[in-house]
Amino acid sequence: MRALRLVTSESVTEGHPDKLADRISDAILDALIAQDKKARVAAETLVTTGLVFVAGEITTEGYVDIPNLVRKTVREVGYTRAKYGFDADTCAVLTAIDEQSPDIAGGVNLSYEWRVLKSTDPLDRVGAGDQGLMFGYATDETPELMPLPITLAHRLTMRLAEVRKTGLLPYLRPDGKAQVTVVYEGDKPLYVKTVVVSAQHSPEVEQEQLREDLIREVVRQAIPPEYLKDGETEYLINPSGRFILGGPHADTGLTGRKIIVDTYGGAVPHGGGAFSGKDPTKVDRSASYYARYMAKNIVAAGLARRALVELAYAIGKARPVSLRVETFGTGVLPDEKLTEIAKKVFDPRPLAIIEELDLLRPIYTPTSAYGHFGRPGFPWEETDRVEALRREAGL
């Protein structure tokens, strides 16, 4: 028997203050990119008691009524009553928006390859919006080709929001969190060791009723029964006790503070760049999406059971300064060979990514909660490079 290990991941609901900030930032991005595909957007949001503050750098021919859009977004999430301590109709909305730095714009609009190397390749024209490293990952332990702990954590928070919105558990409020610890034997997930659910609620509900309801209607609906082991799985439901004050009234929220929730739950490294509120010339976002696309196709093609793709960029330069594939000993070919195959099949230049994944569309608000990866409907989740990868691998 191989040694057992524990892997833990967390998720938060759309009503968590950091996620509310992410959603507002992405709503602004979507509203602008729907009008102006060339919009350059870096929208940052802070939410606290009675206040939303939106700042950032935006260059666009479009126009968005930011205060009205903020209120609409807050209302959609569910902060609609003053007793929640944060209300869409009464919160103040402040803005401080500048244009994108002309120095940055110059390097993005006309890349190092065009300016210095005199390239005439159209896909070389747009440079990366910043330096940095980005990671994409896929694993065959779930149908979504995502790590099991983060997949289950997202299912819990999505279910928590669902039972609130449908009125099945009418005493729930928008804020909430979940955490899942999974027992692994080697790379194989065996069962869930610990489930943590913290749900904001009205003062009237008793803790015992809350516990029973959340185990029955949330945990057992979200986690497949084969992963819940009698006598082994521990259920920690609101382990701190009462959770009446929540959302921005209890904790200040900021865009970009849930980067591990947004990605792979800590299963692999993270380059540090956040996603929400950024247009796709920002490789923090678009290259992370493309790295996931690459990794998922490698696993879907049967070239590895686990694949990590690392990309790195220099600001103003179109071509990555590095590209690496790592398969943790699960690849059918050496990692060096898979890296060479990936370079032939994929094109991670910013403009190529934008065109291939069709990223100049208002598709970003749904990504702002419950993870950017492992959900259908996003172009970076497609597996349309499988045949090309298998051909290059000689399979």
Curated annotation (Swiss-Prot):
Residues at which ATP binds: H16, D175, G176, K177, R242, F243, D251, R257, K258, A274, K278
Pathway(s) the chain acts in: Amino-acid biosynthesis; S-adenosyl-L-methionine biosynthesis; S-adenosyl-L-methionine from L-methionine: step 1/1
Binding site residues for L-methionine: E57, Q100, D251, K282
Residues at which K(+) binds: E44
GO annotation, biological process: one-carbon metabolic process; S-adenosylmethionine biosynthetic process
Subunit description: Homotetramer; dimer of dimers.
Family: Belongs to the AdoMet synthase family.
Name under which the protein is recorded: S-adenosylmethionine synthase
Source organism: Thermus thermophilus (strain ATCC BAA-163 / DSM 7039 / HB27)
Gene (name only): metK
